Amino acid sequence: QFAKQICNDYNPIHDPDSKRFCVPGDLLFALSLNNYGLSEKMNFDFSGLVPADKLLVFPTAENSELVIKDEREKAYLTLVREGDNNPDPKAIEYLVRSYVAFSGHSFPYILVPLMEQHQVMINNNRPLVMYQSMSLNLDQLELNKPEVKLINADMQVEGKRGNVTLHFAINDGDKAVGRGEKKLVLSGLREFDAQAMEQLIKEYEARKV
């Protein structure tokens, strides 16, 4: 429900009824901030898809580098933090809600124009867009109404793989308070087909009903 209700993300692999279900990367991001607070610099590297039945272990906040693993020591997320820290739950909630709302609009509003530009598209029968990494740089840690806005997006195509980087700004009111970037991997790329893409978007939008 996090993906749908908070992120407005209707990716089929985030549907609990899907056989391919995995925990949304944005949920791992939110849980990490909830556990460790906001730091001036934060880098998140995702190293695996988390199945529904996995119990994750969040280590105590003793080090600048924290690795979130399951009970069998398989790593799923590495968080590296620098600078001052703010554990205020309100500031964390404000930033999480703004960021995941931005993130949830990646498809179709950002990714489809990129794919069309490069004349490639994800497999419409098994669409797969994966979180690779994300970084945040905050100029201040006291946040009231942060808003995450896209600056620009680019895509590098390597065979059937597409590497996408979303650059974004973080504003609080009329003040710039930070910036960051999100990296995604698009798998199983094929030649762009406008009709197939239109159908994929329709199916995605239908999940919102």
Regions found by a protein language model. Give the residues of each.
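HotDog/MaoC-like acyl-thioester-processing domains
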Residues: Q1-F2, V50-A52, T60-E147, Q156-V209
